Amino acid sequence: DGRITVPGFYDDVEEVPQTEREMIAHIPFDEKKYKEAIGVKELFGEKGYSTLERNSCRPSFDVCGIWGGYTGEGSKTVLPSKAYAKVSCRLVPHQDHHKISQMFADYILSIAPDTVQVKVTPMHGGQGYVCPISLPAYQAAEKGFEIAFGKKPLAVRRGGSIPIISTFEQ
């Protein structure tokens, strides 16, 4: 169903409000052009959500890289003794990066064969944040945009690596 299979991953994820889903549905978006731009034949992800919703309002689990063994030119027949992977998660409000890191580590250890050694090293993390469009600062920015460009901006969530924002809110 396109969901992340780490047990408990979605426990603290709030459903996207219907009003926001309707706003997202009105954003001009050409899925065919998007697929061409990123060089894929098909898009996939959590069922029941549009591509824009999956890219903005829903958490993600991303494999950033996998490597191990011989990676130079030519072929080798030696089995590698080590393999590595770098993964990241885009979290949404109310998901705690410490909790998610622990759930991921517990899950990987639970599915790994007893014959291998597994080490999970959390690197860093930040809390998700959504700026309410009812916030006076947002409304002032929206009004300024409308004055400058002659039309209202579209309210679009964008996942990003600005973990300090949730600290500003607090």
What are these regions (language model features)?
Residues 1-169:
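Metal-dependent amide/peptide-bond hydrolase catalytic core
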